[in-house]
Amino acid sequence: MSQKVATKTAPVPESILKKRATSQKKAVDVAKLGRAQQLRNSRLNSVYFKRAEKYVSEYHKTEREAIRLNRIAKNSGTFYVPPAAKVAFVIRIRGINGVSPKPRKVLKLLRLLQLNNGVFVKLNKASINMLKLVEPYVAYGFPNLKSIKELIYKRGHLKIDGQRIPLTSNDMVEKQLGKFGIICVEDIIHEITTCGKHFKQVNNSLWPFKLNCPRGGFNMKKTPFLQGGDAGNREHLINNLIHRMN
């Protein structure tokens, strides 16, 4: 009758056991971080959605109020005068050949260093005077919500450490502007549209918009818009130009 010989299992070296324990701990930690990140993302997505809903409601309310006031004015035989625009969108349409030093300096202050670059500008006495100085070299007017959204979603870039980085996620917004309560792209759009209290910080964080040449081209760059050209203030008609260049 054969006898079974007991075999001894060689002990696992302590170094390997330590490596296994470390690997298992890392796996557990990664899993915990993954769950924590999922919960955080879920909470943030809920916040983003609620903010977007709030802004849409606010925009609709403003629009309905304007329609109501216009109807009242019409029924009473008067005219409804909408509130003065608070924000302009300025597009550089001419080069610097022959530009005198003062307009050249203003173009630099406006960050309009290249042709077909566009920027948002908060309208006040000082900025209006600056725009008058550079009117022969720019086209500007009052962007609507649709234009602002399309510009930011399609051509928005953030200035991060002096570099032009595509605006591709809400995380980027929060890292750059979270200290001002701006945590998502819709916050940026709202701040620009309403000319909010952090307009300056938000606008400075946006790289100038690089636009295309307008479909169909310009008519007469050197001629004022009111005389059938392209230069200067075109008020709400700037939205047509933005659409052609975006």
Curated annotation (Swiss-Prot):
InterPro entries: Ribo_uL30_ferredoxin-like_sf (IPR036919), Ribosomal_uL30 (IPR039699), Ribosomal_uL30_CS (IPR018038), Ribosomal_uL30_euk (IPR005998), Ribosomal_uL30_euk_arc (IPR035808), Ribosomal_uL30_ferredoxin-like (IPR016082), Ribosomal_uL30_N_euk (IPR012988). It comes from the Eukaryota. GO terms for cellular component: cytosolic large ribosomal subunit; extracellular matrix. Keywords: Ribonucleoprotein, Ribosomal protein, RNA-binding. One of its GO terms (biological process) is maturation of LSU-rRNA from tricistronic rRNA transcript (SSU-rRNA, 5.8S rRNA, LSU-rRNA). GO terms for molecular function: RNA binding; structural constituent of ribosome. Pfam families: Ribosomal_L30 (PF00327), Ribosomal_L30_N (PF08079). SUPFAM superfamilies: Ribosomal protein L30p/L7e. Binds to G-rich structures in 28S rRNA and in mRNAs. Plays a regulatory role in the translation apparatus; inhibits cell-free translation of mRNAs. Belongs to the universal ribosomal protein uL30 family. PANTHER family: 60S RIBOSOMAL PROTEIN L7 (PTHR11524), LARGE RIBOSOMAL SUBUNIT PROTEIN UL30 (PTHR11524:SF16). This is Large ribosomal subunit protein uL30. It comes from Dictyostelium discoideum (Social amoeba). The gene is rpl7.
